[in-house]
């Protein structure tokens, strides 16, 4: 057997080097990014979302439709984060269509921050809660949650509790006012009403003669959002396509 001289051995793996770690692959390099957009506020672009692309010509629409996200009202009305007003309201959106690189979303509810809700509750005051189901013009059903807290009626008294009869009347007036202003309107108008304090001030004005209160709409929850319901057409159903093709062949 021939013995090779020192230094004449050939390495099997010429490219490998000792002590050099393998570079980590970026997990987002194979993702496709889409813009989250809506048309209800001055700022229409609300960030991006992504999904792994497994094939070059794969349609990612089924994976994107139905995604939800929430945006602060200050970011919806001002593009500059330094000048944006810190609002306690967060508007929720849901993706219902994909157009190019844009995920078009629709209104899907509103919620006030936890800090604002807990800050309303005070010691020796009465908390009045109400929830009202409403129906918008497009047939969508929503549930509106309202919280009201009694104010100081007598400055010399330490406790400011409302009677049970007063609580019933206040809750009844809140329900009537909500149905009067929100029931049967369009979704765009509903969003405009929720983005201001006008309806809450109306609650306080109508209930002031019974007992002074501080009111706020804390949440709007979708029960049946017609904008998010995708109607399956006849052309999209493969069973109907097969039956149509068979009938065409028989007619020929």
From Swiss-Prot:
Alphabetical list of PANTHER family matching this protein: 40S RIBOSOMAL PROTEIN S3A
Organism: Enterocytozoon bieneusi (strain H348) (Microsporidian parasite)
Pfam families linked: Ribosomal_S3Ae
Location of the protein in the cell: Cytoplasm
One GO cellular component term noted in the UniProt record for this chain: cytosolic small ribosomal subunit
Complex and partners: Component of the small ribosomal subunit. Mature ribosomes consist of a small (40S) and a large (60S) subunit. The 40S subunit contains about 33 different proteins and 1 molecule of RNA (18S). The 60S subunit contains about 49 different proteins and 3 molecules of RNA (25S, 5.8S and 5S).
Protein name as it appears in the record: Small ribosomal subunit protein eS1
Membership in a protein family: Belongs to the eukaryotic ribosomal protein eS1 family.
Main location as per UniProt: cytoplasm
InterPro entries, per database record: Ribosomal_eS1 (IPR001593), Ribosomal_eS1_euk (IPR027500)
Gene Ontology terms describing biological process: translation
Keywords: Cytoplasm, Ribonucleoprotein, Ribosomal protein
One Gene Ontology term of the molecular function aspect: structural constituent of ribosome
């Amino acid at each position: 057997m021939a013995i090779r001289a020192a230094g004449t051995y050939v390495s099997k793996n010429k490219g490998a080097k000792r002590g050099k770690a393998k570079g980590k692959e970026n997990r987002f390099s194979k993702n496709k990014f889409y813009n989250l957009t809506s048309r209800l506020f001055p700022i229409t672009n609300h960030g991006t979302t992504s999904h792994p692309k497994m094939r070059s010509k794969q349609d990612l629409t089924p994976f994107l439709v139905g995604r939800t996200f929430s945006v602060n009202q200050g970011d919806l009305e001002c593009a500059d984060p330094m000048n944006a007003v810190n609002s306690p309201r967060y508007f929720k959106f849901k993706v219902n269509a994909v157009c190019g690189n844009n995920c078009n979303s629709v209104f899907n509810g509103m919620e006030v921050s936890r800090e604002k809700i807990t800050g309303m509750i005070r010691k020796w005051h009465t908390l009045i809660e109400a929830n009202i189901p409403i129906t918008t013009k497009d047939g969508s059903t929503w549930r509106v949650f309202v919280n009201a807290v009694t104010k100081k009626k007598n400055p010399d008294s330490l406790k400011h509790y409302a009677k049970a009869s007063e609580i019933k009347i206040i809750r009844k007036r809140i329900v009537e006012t909500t149905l009067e202003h929100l029931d049967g309107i369009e979704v765009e108008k509903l969003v405009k009403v929720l983005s201001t304090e006008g309806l809450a001030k109306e609650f306080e004005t109508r209930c002031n003669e019974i007992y002074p209160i501080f009111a706020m709409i804390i949440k709007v929850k979708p029960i049946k959002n017609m904008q998010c319901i995708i109607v399956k057409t006849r052309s999209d159903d493969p069973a109907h396509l097969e039956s149509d093709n068979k009938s065409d062949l028989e007619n020929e």
